[in-house]
Amino acid sequence: MRYAIIILMALVLANCSNDDKKINETEYLISDSILAWDTNLDSMIMRRDSTIPDSGITIKRIINGLNEKYPEVYIDFLKQGGDTAYTGVPDADYLGEQMGDAGAMAWFADAVINITSVPGINYVSFKMDTHSHASSTVIGRGEYNDWKKE
């Protein structure tokens, strides 16, 4: 009987743990390259990527996502001032001369919608050389308020 109590106590103590892990705690592995929104200029629809938690949306990840999606149009994050993200497109030839009006508009929409999904950013300033279909500008998220969100 004494051995049974000792074994029972040992089992109880062995099963007690002081882990700080919460039951049902979900861990997210977030890529360094994301786009929070999938945009479609033709239908004026933006679809939120539900696999990305709000806490995972950072300017660095969004910029990396844009550069991965549009390798011909490299965008740099320069700084944040107030609610504006300042960016640069060092070589805007492809954007301004080869993508056409619709392509450039789609790129700007994708960039603005995704960059302004970062908390605290409402405007994006683009610095680039002037081209036929693209030039330096500042665009706010409000430009896309009439788009349907899904």
How would you label these PLM feature ranges?
Residues M1-R2, K79:
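A generic structural motif
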Residues R2-Y3, V138:
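Short glycine/proline-enriched turn or capping motifs at secondary-structure junctions
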Residues Y3-L13:
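Sec-dependent N-terminal signal peptides
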